[in-house]
Amino acid sequence: MSGEEDLIDYSDDELNNETTAPASNGKKGDAAAAAQNVDKKGSYVGIHSTGFRDFLLKPELLRAIADCGFEHPSEVQQTCIPQAMLGGDIICQAKSGLGKTAVFVLTTLQQVEPVAGECSVLVMCHTRELAFQIRNEYNRFSKYMPDIKTGVFYGGTPIQKDAEVLKNKETHPHIIVGTPGRLNALVRDKHLRLGNVRMFVLDECDKMLDQIDMRRDVQEIFRATPQQKQVMMFSATLADEIKPICRKFMQNPTEHYVDEDTKLTLHGLQQYYIPLEEREKNRKLNELLDELQFNQVIIFVKSTIRATELDKLLRECNFPSIAVHSGVSQEERIRRYKEFKEFNKRICVATDVFGRGIDIERINLAINYDLPADADSYLHRVGRAGRFGTKGLAISFVNSDQDKEVLQQIEKRFEVALPEFPKEGIDASTYMAA
C-alpha cells in the first residue's frame, strides 16, 4: 500500500493558476418551460413533495423532502430529474444555488439497490469541503433509508482508516463521495473495487476535467468501473473546450443548459466595485465591515498567505473572523467550515478553494479583496452570497490594470454594468432579506 505522500493534493495555487474559457450560450432544456414560481426556503432550493410524487420517488425520499420543508422544484430539478430517472447520461449546466446537487442525490438514492460490501454510486468533486457537504446531503435525504450507507473519502486524512472502512462489509458504503486523488489511490491499492458501480457522478465537472492531474485521476477511476453505467456531470460554468471532454465519458448524453450564458448572473444579488490602491484595502475593508449590515460575509483573497495574514489582522481588530484555505490541515479545515456554517463565526477569509459549490445559506455579503483572474471564478465567488435566489451583496476591490481588464471581461461576459460603490453607501434593504 502506498503512503500518503503518493496522493495528489490540489493546492489553491493550482486552482488560482487555472484559466477557464468563457462558456458558450446555453440552450434551454425542453422541460425548462414547466418551471413555475420557484420558492426558495430553508437551506436548499425548495422542492414540493407533491411534485416529486409525479417523479414516482420512493415514500422514504418524499418523507425526507417534507421534513426539510422544501416546497417547489427548481427549474434545473424539473428539467433533469425525469431524464436522470430514466437512467440516461446527463450533462447539466445551471447557475449556482439552484439545486443541482439535489438532482443527483435524489436520483441516485431512488435507484440504488444496496448490496453489502459493494459500491453502486460514485460521486466525485474537486475539493474536500464540497465532498463533505455532498455526503451530508445524502445523509439528510436518506434519513428514512437505514440500509443505505454513505461514505466520504478525501486526502489529508490517514488512508489506512479509509482502507479499514472498505475492508469490512458491515461498514463498506453503498454510496461513495470523494476527491479524485484519494479515490484513485484507494483503487490503485485495491482497497476500493468499483466493479459494481451503476451511477458515476462528477460535480463541478469542469474543475476536474480542465486540470491535467485531476483529469488523469478521473480517467483511471472511470476505467475501473463497468462499461454499462449511468454518467451524470454538473457545473455552473461549462466552457466550449470542456464539453467534448465530458462527452467522451458518456453514451449519447442529454444536455441541459438551464440558463443561457448571459443569465448566469444571480438574481437578487447587488454587485459593485471600489477603485483603490493596494495599501488602501485594509482600511476600506474595515470600513465596510463596520458600516454594512450582514448576516455572514466571505472575503476572497488570492493566496493562502494573504488569507492567513488578513484573518489575523481582522481578529486583532476584534472582528469574529476565520480562515479557510489549503494551508491548514484537513481536519482543521473541516472544523472551521462547520464552525462558520453553524454561525459560530460571521466572517470567513478564503481562497478559491472555497469558491465553488459551498452552500451556507446565511452568507449575504461577498467581498473580493483580490479580484479573481477570470469571469467564471468571479461568478462562483459572488455566488456564495445570494444563494437559493435570496438577496445578497457583492463588492470587488479593483486596484490594478489587470483587475480593470477582468472587470471588463465580467461586464462583457454577463452583459451587465457593474457600478462603483456609492460613497454614501447603499440601503440595507436592497441586499438584506426582510
UniProtKB/Swiss-Prot annotation:
A motif (Q motif) lies at residues 50-78. SMART domains: DEXDc, HELICc. Keywords: ATP-binding, Helicase, Hydrolase, mRNA processing, mRNA splicing, mRNA transport, Nucleotide-binding, Nucleus, RNA-binding, Spliceosome, Transport. GO terms for biological process: mRNA processing; mRNA transport; RNA splicing. One of its GO terms (cellular component) is spliceosomal complex. Residues 1-16 have a biased composition (Acidic residues). ATP binds at A94, K95, S96, G97, L98, G99, K100, T101. GO terms for molecular function: ATP binding; ATP hydrolysis activity; RNA binding; RNA helicase activity. It catalyses: ATP + H2O = ADP + phosphate + H(+). Residues 1-32 are annotated as: Disordered. It is an enzyme of class 3 (hydrolase). Residues 81-256 form the Helicase ATP-binding domain. The Q motif is unique to and characteristic of the DEAD box family of RNA helicases and controls ATP binding and hydrolysis. Belongs to the DEAD box helicase family. DECD subfamily. This is ATP-dependent RNA helicase SUB2.
